[in-house]
Amino acid sequence: MPLLQGLSMYARLVVSLPALLRQQDTPEKGLALLRERQQSREANLLRLLERAVYADPRSPYLHLLRHAGCELGDLRRLVPQLGVEATLERLRAEGVVVRFEQFKGREPMVVGGREIPVRPEDFASPVSAPHLMGLSSGSTGARVSQPVSFEHKGAQRAVRLAVRQLQGVLGPPRAVIVGTLPESSRFGGALDGGGAGNLPERWFTPVLSPPRVPELRFRIAHRFVVAMARLHGLRIPRPEPLPVAEVARVAHWAVDAVRRRGAAVVQATPSMALRIALAARSEGLDLGGVTFTTGGEPLTEAKRQRILDSGAQVICSYHMKEAGMIGAACVRPSGPNDQHVMTPHVALIQGRREVIGQPVDALLVTQLLESSPRVLLNVETDDFGVLEQRRCGCPLDALGLHLHVRDVRSYKKLTAEGVTLVGSDLERVLESELPERFGGSPLDYQLVEEEDAEGFTRICLRISPSVAIADEDAVVAALREGLRRASISADLAFRLWNQSGAIRVDRVAPPMSVRGKLFPIQSSRREAAARRGAGSS
């Protein structure tokens, strides 16, 4: 970041932070905002397009919109006539779509046969300047800068309180498992709103291996924000390093909190929640009264069941770093990964695309809040899932949030010997069938796409050394059998890989990402890119 730009950003930080810390938010205020924004979606979308797209000659979206022959006047006519989602569907059909890799700056946009190079910062909003810069997790490639806007946090804070109250997780003692800058801009809950019992009691920070020391600029910014929060009377807990081998500490805290107050809430990724649940069971702890609020990765049925076996409850929300909360966990879900789309803040539609010859309904997100530091207009999320209108009868449904998104999965894929598998074919086998047959948990198995010394792509099945396996070939055979049942294409892919020697077993523990996520499918190239991004950040 250029020096003057950085100084300007930190000046905004010093000026804006006290106002955010003084902001009084309540669940009642959040409910009022939800109703107001739900009623104003069309006006909010048009205002955002006018100020952040059509008024900005550098906006990448202008290339797409003008190639589609769409001017602001056309949208002013279409949006009231068709509604938000139908208008976005019309734009998608005309090619107004930004692919996930383009939004991350890894591929150029192609408009009318012409390549247009783009960077992540090209999608910055001209009407909402950032106050801090964090970094993405790097789980899908090299880490990129993530702008943090206090204005945007302030616009969502009361709403988050309202959602937590409706989900029944506002008030009990809470522990958060999040990092510090640049991994997370949560500051241990300092900016989540100090009222309504929302401050966490404990703040655990995952310890990476090997340890990573944040740059000086991140350490200074982090300490400044936390110190200012404490000066404003917010009793933010001190971060406690949490190695993976010591996650039972969280379970012991939760059991004690239930004893003291009757309930406890732990905020973590699904993978971290599963680790805590397994640690509790191994130590004979009953997590009855504990609720895990999760996000950042899908809550699969296998993870959910293992967590429930500990006595705890678990809900999962759908987040995207650039868009915020896309889906809020339904408390009367149709499955483990069922959320109410936060339609007051975002619009979510689907676009059919081909992934290795198979059609998937990719999710496209549009941000409706003008306070967002990134402009998102029909941006692919790298996920697919099911969108449906459903009346579930839960408190969020009563607010008019009838659009649900469920069964969200990434269409990450493994490719070797010219044959590719979509991740959904592999997930059930890795997370359910192999642990049931050979022991361990969904955290102990992972498939990785890698290159050998000669440049051939190979598939590595990682199995944690903690799982006692006498015959590794039996695991490979079980993997093949599971894929044979999954689909014809999965069976054919595995047969070819096995025949060409493209599969090997590695007895190492599958690593978690910087935010405590564990993906059952990974690419060594993505891992290497993430490490390079971390080193150059």
What are these regions (language model features)?
Residues M1-L46, S59, F187, L199, ...:
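AMP-binding adenylation
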Residues L4, S8, R12-L21, E36-S310, ...:
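Active-site phosphate/ATP/adenylate-binding loop shared across adenylate-forming ligases
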Residues D122-V127, H340-V341, G501-I503:
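Short loop/turn motifs at secondary-structure junctions and domain boundaries
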Residues V127, V346, D506-V508:
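Short loop/turn microsegments at loop-to-beta-strand junctions
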Residues G138, R353-E354, S513:
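Short, acidic, Ser/Thr-enriched surface-loop or helix-capping motifs
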Residues R275, A302, Q358, L421-S424, ...:
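Residues that form or flank phosphate/diphosphate-binding pockets in enzymes
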Residues V290, T294, P298-C392:
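Conserved AMP-binding/adenylate-forming
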